Amino acid sequence: MNISIISVGKIKEKFLKAAIDEYSKRLSKYCKLNIIEVTDEKTPDNASLKEENIIKDKEGNLILKHIKDNSFVIALDLKGKSITSEEFSGLIENCRLTGNSTIAFVIGGSLGLSEQVLSRANYKLSFSKMTFPHQLFRVMLLEQVYRAFRILCGEPYHK
């Protein structure tokens, strides 16, 4: 299975890079992982709604360029569905069983995802009603993908 994580912005913090590297290494046993970072647009202070939408559209166009036609796209969105880790593993397994060998997870920037990206998504997922820094969220997503594969393989993993 091929897993892509397409995210706005670059990781600068060493501790986050180390965590991403660790989960990437762990996941190599289960899938081919591709992490893609697209450029984040600078948001001016006191940006209008129109300016924010323009920024989201620019970031969205960069994201869409990296989504393959055959990808099952999971957009991480505050308005998405909240599910358990077991349900998440079932979602990944269902992709595999229905012939979707490529899953693209999409993480927006500080303003979220554009309507075009949300429209392309096959599934909208929310981890919480809380807002997280998108850099930290990559680690959280990788941990849950790793946990999902452990669940699917019937392997133990701490709770």
Swiss-Prot record:
Subunit structure: Homodimer.
E.C. code: 2.1.1.177
Full protein name: Ribosomal RNA large subunit methyltransferase H
InterPro entries (alphabetical): Alpha/beta_knot_MTases, RlmH-like, tRNA_m1G_MTases_N
Source species, domain of life: Bacteria
Entry GO CC: cytoplasm
UniProt similarity note: Belongs to the RNA methyltransferase RlmH family.
Function: Specifically methylates the pseudouridine at position 1915 (m3Psi1915) in 23S rRNA.
Key words, A-Z: Cytoplasm, Methyltransferase, rRNA processing, S-adenosyl-L-methionine, Transferase
Record's catalysed reaction(s): pseudouridine(1915) in 23S rRNA + S-adenosyl-L-methionine = N(3)-methylpseudouridine(1915) in 23S rRNA + S-adenosyl-L-homocysteine + H(+)
PANTHER family: METHYLTRANSFERASE, RIBOSOMAL RNA LARGE SUBUNIT METHYLTRANSFERASE H
Residues noted as binding S-adenosyl-L-methionine in the record, renumbered to the chain: 76, 108, 127-132
GO molecular function, one term: rRNA (pseudouridine-N3-)-methyltransferase activity
Presence of the UniProt keyword S-adenosyl-L-methionine in the record: yes
Entry's localization field: Cytoplasm
Top-level class of the enzyme under EC nomenclature: transferase
